[in-house]
Regions:
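Solvent-exposed loop/turn and edge beta-strand elements of beta-rich ligand-binding domains
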Residues: 1-210
Length: 210
């Protein structure tokens, strides 16, 4: 069957996705509270993985990391006292499509508190600890935007130590003071035993305590 573009029975389908247009980008920021940070565990390093499918059906996967060195932490604390410490990465040259970001790394010492975003094309799932973006020109989908961003806020996992004081006969001793010191010799906390001879120190950051 020979076709003619002027044939009224012929339907011509045109792909409206222009590959020559500007591509998308997503910026992810990692935020830490300097008041809840112990650099003795090493430089906190977090890995962000961005996966998605573009409008042509092709799957994509990207990975970037941020590393909080001691020098960087000290600089930010000096320049912006009292503020959160933040580092960002940007995924550039993204084809139009839907992309989801999650994080990894340092799970032994840190937990994710929350994900926030001011981007209208972002959908956050706090339970799954992910954020999804619709990347494309305005109007391509109901939420599409060329750029997007989100912030992952983390907190160091805190532990506790329970101490029990008894005499040689096994009797619980009350009002016995214990002092907890960190690996650098600094006093972290002190408290006295209760009527059961017990004392608990909560809110301890990862470290070696004496």
């Amino acid at each position: 069957y020979d076709t003619d573009e002027n044939d009224q029975d012929l339907t011509v389908i045109t792909n409206t996705h222009d590959r020559t247009g500007p591509k998308g980008s997503i910026t992810i920021t990692k935020a830490l509270d300097p008041g809840n940070l112990n650099m003795d565990v090493g430089d906190p390093t977090f890995i962000f993985t961005l996966t998605g499918t573009d409008v042509y059906g092709k799957k994509h996967s990207y990975e970037k990391k941020v590393k909080f060195t001691k020098a960087e932490v000290e600089k930010q604390m000096k320049d912006h006292p009292g503020d959160l410490i933040e580092l960002s990465v940007t995924f550039d040259d993204l084809e139009y499509g839907t992309y989801t970001c999650n994080e990894g790394g340092m799970i032994k010492y840190f937990k994710l508190l929350n994900i926030t975003s001011n981007s209208s094309n972002a959908t956050i799932d706090q339970e799954k600890e992910t954020v999804t973006f619709d990347i494309g020109p305005t109007g391509m989908t109901a939420k599409a935007q060329l750029t997007g961003g989100a912030k992952f806020m983390n907190q160091m996992i805190q532990g506790s130590v329970k101490l029990i004081k008894k005499d040689s006969k096994g009797k619980s001793l009350r009002n016995i003071e214990f002092v907890i010191t960190s690996s650098d010799g600094a006093e972290v906390a002190k408290a006295k035993t209760d009527s059961d001879g017990e004392v608990t120190f909560d809110g301890l950051l990862p470290d070696t305590y004496t």
